[in-house]
Amino acid sequence: MEPLGDRRPCCVCITKNRNCPRFCEYAEYFPYELRSHYESTNELFGTPKIIKMMRHAPEEKKQMLATSIIMEGNAWTNDPVSGGFGMVQKIMWKIMLHKAYLHELEEKIKEEKEKIELHL
């Protein structure tokens, strides 16, 4: 973790209305620059629950957890009805469309190859 120095307080300390300590355990995962994303995350989970999740996570998984927490908050902001599940559904739908398009292209390539072979 970096010393406070010139950095701004982390999002967790801002929402808890406390001074961000020099070696804040949350500054690395929720820096000031992510405050707009953290706001939606805070609305969804609440800072106490975020702190609890981060404290129970193994050190090597904390960055992944913080990223997941913020992504989930953003997903619910963008799609208040379906949240992350809606995001996954949209991605799966796009994959299906791209697979169908790829299949069409493969068929056209196959047809063109057959035409070329007939002319040789």
Curated annotation (Swiss-Prot):
Coiled coil: none annotated. Residues 8-109 form the LOB domain. It comes from the Eukaryota. Belongs to the LOB domain-containing protein family. This is LOB domain-containing protein 8. It comes from Arabidopsis thaliana. The gene is LBD8.
